[in-house]
C-alpha cells in the first residue's frame, strides 16, 4: 500500500491520488507491503529506488546506516504485537533525499498509526523531512516506555502468584507468562539499542537542522534512561524464575520424601509377610491358633517402629 503526505499550513495531509495530486507534492512517502506497481510509481515519479526485502533483513551496521547517491538510509527496528499478542520487531527502512522522507515496511506498526493520528491535530514546527523522522522515533520510544511500564505491572502480579508458592493451574500460567515477559523485554532492549545506533548515526552524518539535532539528543537521553529499567526487568524476571524453580524443587522434594517414607515404612511389614509366605513344611507358627493375628500385629509393629523413629528424629 502506498500513502503520501504533503505539508499544508504546517500540517501533514494525506495526498488524494484520485483527485489528481501527485507524489511530487509529498513530504513523506509511506509504503506498507508495497506491490511492484507501487515501487515502480515511486521510481518513475520521484526517481527513488526502494530497499528490497533481503536488504531490510541485513543486521550489519554498514547495511543499516549509510549514505549514498540515493540519500541517507537508516534501517531501524519497530516493536509490534500481532493479532495473537505475540511480540516482534519489524524493520523500517527510512530514506531522506531531496527534502523528502521515504518509509518502507512490511506491516502496519503501532508507532506509525499513532503518529498519523497525532498529525491530524498537531502542526510541525519546521516542516521538514527530518522533523517527521524524529517525530516517528520519538513516538517509538514513547511506545517502548509504555511497554516497559506494562511489563512492570505484569511482573508485579506474577510476583504475588509465584511467592505464594501454591502450585496448580495458576502457577503454570504464571510461569508461561514469565517466559513471555522475558521475551518481550529482550525485544524491547533490541529495539532500544538499535534506535540508539540509528540516532547516533544521524547525529554524526545526517547534518540535522538545529531543532532536529536537539530532538535527536533528547531521544538519546530518553533511551539512556530506559535501558536501566529494561535491565532491571531482566533481573526481576530472572529472580522470579529462580524462585519458581525453587518452589518446584521443594515440592518435588516433598513428593520424593513421601515416597521414601512410605517405602521404608512398608519394607519391614513386607519382610514379615514374605517370611510367613514361604512354603516350608516345618513352620511352627502355621499351626498356632493365634499365628495369623500375631503375624498381622508383628507387621503393624514393624511398620510403626521406623515411622515413630523418623518422627522422633524430626525427619518427617
From Swiss-Prot:
It comes from the Bacteria. One of its GO terms (cellular component) is plasma membrane. The chain crosses the membrane at residues 258-278, 290-310. It is found in: Cell inner membrane. The central ion permeation pathway is formed by the first transmembrane domain from each of the five subunits. Mg(2+) binding strengthens interactions between subunits and leads to the formation of a symmetrical homopentamer surrounding a closed ion permeation pathway. Low Mg(2+) concentrations trigger both a conformation change within each subunit and a loosening of the interactions between subunits. This results in an open ion conduction pathway. In addition, this results in a less symmetrical shape of the whole complex. Belongs to the CorA metal ion transporter (MIT) (TC 1.A.35) family. This is Magnesium transport protein CorA. It comes from Photorhabdus laumondii subsp. laumondii (strain DSM 15139 / CIP 105565 / TT01) (Photorhabdus luminescens subsp. laumondii).
Amino acid at each position: 500500500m502506498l500513502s503520501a503526505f504533503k505539508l499544508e499550513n504546517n500540517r501533514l495531509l494525506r495526498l488524494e491520488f484520485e483527485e489528481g495530486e501527485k507524489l511530487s507534492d509529498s513530504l513523506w512517502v509511506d509504503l506498507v507491503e508495497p506491490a511492484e506497481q507501487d515501487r515502480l510509481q515511486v521510481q518513475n515519479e520521484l526517481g527513488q529506488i526502494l530497499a528490497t526485502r533481503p536488504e531490510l533483513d541485513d543486521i550489519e551496521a554498514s547495511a543499516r546506516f549509510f549514505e549514498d547517491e540515493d540519500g541517507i538510509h537508516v534501517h531501524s527496528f519497530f516493536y509490534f504485537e500481532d493479532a495473537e499478542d505475540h511480540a516482534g520487531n519489524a524493520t523500517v527502512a527510512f530514506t531522506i533525499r531531496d527534502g523528502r522522507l521515504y518509509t518502507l515496511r512490511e506491516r502496519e506498526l503501532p508507532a506509525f498509526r499513532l503518529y498519523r493520528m497525532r498529525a491530524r491535530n498537531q502542526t510541525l514546527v519546521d516542516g521538514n523531512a527530518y522533523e517527521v523522522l524524529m517525530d516517528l522515533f520519538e513516538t517509538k520510544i514513547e511506545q517502548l516506555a509504555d511497554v516497559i511500564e506494562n511489563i512492570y505491572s505484569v511482573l508485579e502480579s506474577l510476583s504475588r502468584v509465584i511467592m505464594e508458592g501454591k502450585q496448580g493451574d495458576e502457577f503454570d500460567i504464571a510461569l508461561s507468562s514469565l517466559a513471555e515477559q522475558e521475551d518481550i523485554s529482550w525485544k524491547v532492549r533490541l529495539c532500544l539499542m538499535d534506535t540508539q545506533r540509528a540516532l547516533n548515526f544521524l547525529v554524526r552524518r545526517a547534518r540535522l537542522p538545529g531543532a532536529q539535532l536537539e530532538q535527536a539528543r533528547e531521544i538519546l537521553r530518553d533511551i539512556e534512561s530506559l535501558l536501566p529499567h529494561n535491565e532491571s526487568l531482566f533481573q526481576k524476571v530472572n529472580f522470579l524464575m529462580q524462585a519458581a524453580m525453587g518452589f518446584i524443587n521443594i515440592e518435588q522434594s516433598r513428593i520424593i520424601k513421601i515416597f521414601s517414607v512410605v517405602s521404608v515404612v512398608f519394607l519391614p511389614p513386607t519382610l514379615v509377610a514374605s517370611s510367613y509366605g514361604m512354603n516350608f513344611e516345618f513352620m511352627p507358627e502355621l499351626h498356632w491358633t493365634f499365628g495369623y493375628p500375631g503375624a498381622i500385629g508383628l507387621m503393624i509393629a514393624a511398620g510403626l517402629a521406623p515411622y515413630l523413629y523418623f518422627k522422633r528424629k524430626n525427619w518427617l
